Amino acid sequence: MAPSNLPESTTPAEVPAPYGTGPAAAAQAASAAGRKPISRVRIHHLQQAKDNGEHFAMLTAYEQYTAEIFDQAGIEVLLVGDSASNNVYGNETSLPVTVDELLPLTRAVSRSAKRALIVADLPFGSYEVSPGQAVATGVRFLKEGLAHAVKIEGTAYYADTVRAMVQAGIPVMAHIGFTPQSEHSLGGYRVQGRGDDAQRLVDDAVALQDAGAFSVLMEMVPAETAAAVDAALRVPTVGIGAGKTTTGQVLVWQDMAGLRGGKMAKFVKQYADLRTTLSDAAAAYGEDVRSGQFPGPEHSF
């Protein structure tokens, strides 16, 4: 998905074609339209995308170099997800990862990305007890992790939690549909929002929006249901396995770039094969070392 050129300040009639090839293209398009290019993506830019029928891209990031690369490629939002549990720490699910494990990753991404909006997941067990617990955890991610916003999973039950966090100055993205932190209660990785359950998702999304969430992310939701949710909301939506009507799309970067290997989820589009590239590079390095070809004279002092 090409990065969008979100406007700094514009009306719908003034919006040019939103697709470029990163900040340079975005700056050129903004200049041609007589607008100031975006130096830092903010929440209101995502809202403008929703209002103007544009789209934005979101990827996970967990450390310096991917944050820099994705930021320079024009990705508007970087998510320091609790998926780090699976993709960094080697766990089978997102449940074991802790606040203290996610904070250093969030800090690294926030320090490295100069333009993207940084959203951090609140991990399982860090916000469910009470709105007060959620506020305290959210403050840590903004203060210690340098994030710009946080994401929490849940239904309309968490509307009071979202409201308390927003009132405390913590921007919140809500996550509905399949929520990985609830995989055991949901019966595993299953599509949500089919049949009679579709209206519940719409109601959850509206309740979380009305509580102050600046965006609603939907995971593994039928395209028709996701379209109904998007139509019911004023705020931008983000999809992962939720069709194409959402304002934004998000993928785990290791899936997008082909690092994970193995069978991918249906909603993943793989844009590279980094697993093969890195494996070939490591094998070639090992062979050069064992054969005495590395280091050569050009690598020695």
From Swiss-Prot:
Q: What does this protein do?
A: Catalyzes the reversible reaction in which hydroxymethyl group from 5,10-methylenetetrahydrofolate is transferred onto alpha-ketoisovalerate to form ketopantoate.
Single annotated GO MF: 3-methyl-2-oxobutanoate hydroxymethyltransferase activity
Q: What is this protein called?
A: 3-methyl-2-oxobutanoate hydroxymethyltransferase
Q: HAMAP family under this entry?
A: PanB
Name the gene for this chain: panB
Report residues binding Mg(2+): D82, D121, E153
Q: Where is the composition biased (Polar residues)?
A: 1-12
Q: Does the keyword Transferase apply?
A: yes
**Residue sites binding 3-methyl-2-oxobutanoate per the record:** D82, S83, D121, K151
Catalytic activity, reaction form: 3-methyl-2-oxobutanoate + (6R)-5,10-methylene-5,6,7,8-tetrahydrofolate + H2O = 2-dehydropantoate + (6S)-5,6,7,8-tetrahydrofolate
Disordered, as annotated region: 1-24
Q: What class of enzyme is it?
A: transferase
InterPro entries xref list: Pantoate_hydroxy_MeTrfase, Pyrv/PenolPyrv_kinase-like_dom, Pyrv_kinase-like_dom_sf
Q: Give the required cofactors.
A: Mg(2+)
Catalytic site:
E219
The EC number on file is: 2.1.2.11
Q: Name one GO cellular component term.
A: cytoplasm
